[in-house]
Amino acid sequence: MVAGGFGAGKTTLVGAVSEIRPLRTEELLSEAGQLVDDTGGVDQKTTTTVAMDFGRITIRSGLSLYLFGTPGQDRFWFLWDELSQGALGAVVLADTRRLEDCFPAVDYFEHRRIPFVVAVNCFSGARTYAEEDVARALDLDRGTPVVLCDARDRASGKDVLIRMVEYAGRMHTARLLESVGQGAGPE
């Protein structure tokens, strides 16, 4: 899954890394939507995802990721439970101009124990922060990766996905070992 706040670059990231033509459900922002959606900081945004984005990328032979980009607005969160079924992990795309928009996605993945990385989309003109400062501001669990990226750049997006796969692999292994350790008792 690729999640994050409104205008953080989720559609852009899925489109940049997908090796197939991405499925997009973009619609023009309406006047009615402007009353509901906070467009502060993303004034140039003219479209929004109304269902999901879908793409696919092969990380290496035998490992393809199906990418589901979530809508950024609260009113579409009911879709997240369906999109997260069977998820290996997630990317929370962050815009430092609206960092507070990440909290719902961070909370969602933490609550469901879905491994995730935070990818800070480095918009031009936005202040750049150190990864540890972003982790502290988002109150992330120790070890949750934070990476800087450019969602428009395929190589940068692929690096984010590789970090997510590596982290998810470590988390799944740790949980497996934990469950095996808990199941073993004295003989």
What is each of the regions a protein language model found here?
Residues M1-T46, G55-Y66:
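Conserved G1/Walker A P-loop phosphate-binding module
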Residues Q73-R98, D107-R112:
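Inter-motif core of Ras-like GTPase G domains
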Residues A105-Y108, D133-V134:
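A general structural detector for well-ordered alpha-helical segments in enzyme core domains, enriched
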Residues S124-S179, E187:
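Canonical P-loop GTPase G-domain recognition
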